[in-house]
């Protein structure tokens, strides 16, 4: 029996995020602020555009990293096998850019980092894996209610350091992507 490097996109994402995490520790947070965190900054700064994508690779600490990567490693390989690396990379990039832009324009005093939006996109996409034309899986409805409902509740009533917006937007991107890619 041999070890197989399955799911190159997902594993690449996990290892890039690990490198960003280690770099953040080595630089005492400077790399996250510079590249792996999105916040309102000058549109003339080229790193503003890098951060729109890069913020999904950065994490605030090991617990944040391990939590997100656990879900990505659990759900990602199945999604990569079903939809292909190119399409899944598109979902990751779309989630990153949309959450980054929303944060940039609507939450000017807030900096976000982490792959939580990608995790929520994967969760909602996964519920479409058994989708048949003309049907909406009950699992999708339940997952949407449980995961997105919790984020809406937390966003309204719980004051913490978590970007519920990124979770909700990631979930929406995943749901729409799962629906649009279901038969392709």
Predicted regions: what they are:
Residues 1-184:
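A detector for small-residue-rich transmembrane helices and their helix-helix packing motifs
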């Amino acid at each position: 029996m041999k070890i197989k490097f399955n799911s190159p996109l997902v594993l690449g994402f996990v290892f890039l995020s690990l490198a960003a995490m280690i770099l953040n520790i080595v630089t005492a947070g400077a790399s996250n602020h510079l590249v792996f965190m999105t916040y309102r900054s000058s549109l003339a700064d080229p790193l503003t555009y890098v951060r729109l994508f890069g913020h999904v690779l950065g994490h605030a600490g090991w617990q944040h990293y391990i939590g997100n990567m656990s879900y990505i490693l659990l759900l990602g390989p199945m999604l990569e096998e079903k939809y292909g690396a190119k399409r899944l990379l598109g979902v990751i990039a779309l989630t990153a850019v949309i959450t980054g832009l929303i944060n940039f324009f609507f939450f000017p005093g807030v900096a976000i980092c982490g792959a939580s939006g990608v995790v929520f996109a994967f969760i909602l996409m996964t519920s479409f894996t058994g989708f048949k034309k003309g049907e909406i899986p009950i699992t999708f409805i339940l997952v949407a209610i449980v995961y997105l409902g919790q984020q809406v509740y937390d966003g309204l009533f719980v004051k913490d350091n978590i970007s519920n917006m990124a979770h909700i937007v990631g979930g929406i991107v995943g749901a729409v992507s799962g629906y649009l890619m279901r038969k392709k």
